[in-house]
Amino acid sequence: FKEGNTVLLNIISKSGSTNETVMNSKVLLKELQKLTNDWAQYVVVTTQPGSKLEDWAQEYDISILPNPKNVGGRYSVFCPVGIFPLALAGIDILKLHKGASKMLVKCFDEDVENNPALQSATAVYRAMQREIPMHNMFLFDQDLERVGKWFRQLTAESLGKDGKGITPLVSIGSTDLHSMVQLYLSGSKNIFTTFVNVKNTGDINIPSIDSQFDEIVPELEKMSVDSVMDAIYKGTKESYENRELPYVEVILDKISEEEIGAFLQFKMVETMLLANLMDINAFDQPNVEEYKKATRRLLN
C-alpha cells in the first residue's frame, strides 16, 4: 500500500460471526486504518444477508457481496465467496462456470455409462458396503493440492453424521509415494482411492549433466519429465492392481479453469448422490456449532 500498490481486504464469513475470521479481520483492519482514512473503500464483505457482519459493513458503506443462505460453505465455490477472490487473482470465472455447467448436464444423465458422478458414487458406496470407510484422493499434480483439501472438507462435512461417514484422505503424487504408499499397499485394506492425473502439464526434457551423473539413473537418459511421471503413475496403479486394491481413475486433459470447474461440479454431485445412498442430509453440518459454542464460552 505504501509503495503505491492497491490493497483489497475481502472479509468472508457466511454466518458473519466466525471466530477466526473476525479475529484476523480486526488485526488487518487496524493496520489498514493506520494507512488511510478512506480504509472502508478497500474492504469488501462477503456474508449472508442479515448477519452482524453485513450490519457492520452497511454502517461504513462497505461493499457487500451476498452469499446465499441456502448454500453451505463447501458448496459455495461458484458463489461470490469463491469466484470473487478467483476473479481478483486473474482466473477466468466464466470458463470455470462453463466447465461446471457442462459437467452438470452429464451428471443429470440417467444412463450410468454417461454419468461420471453416478459411476463414482456407486463405486465408493460399494466400497463402504465392503467395510472400506476411507476415501483417498491421490492427486498426481502438486497444483491440485488445494482441490484435494476442498474435497476433504466436502466429504467430511457432508457425509460425516448420524454415526455414518467416509474418512477423506488427500495424497499428492509423487510426494506421498515416499511417505504414505507403504501403508496404502501393505496396511489394512480399508481405503478406496480416486486417482487424479493430468494429461498435459507442459513437458520438460531432462538434460544431460555429465557421464558420471547420468549413470546414477541411466533410465532417465533422453527422457522427459512427463514421461517419467507417467511411468511413476502407471507403476503406482499397477501396484494397486497387483494387490487388488479398489480405485477409480479421473484424467484431466489439463489444468485449466474449464477442467477444474467440471471436476469441482462432478465431486459435489457425487457427494450428494452418496448422501442419498447413505440416507443422510448432504447439506447441513449440525455438530460444527458445538466447538464454536464451547470456544465462545471459554473466551468469556
Locations of the language-model features?
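Acidic catalytic cores of enzymes that act on phosphate-bearing nucleotides/polynucleotides
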Residues: 91-95, 105-236
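C-terminal amphipathic alpha-helical interaction region
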Residues: 278-300
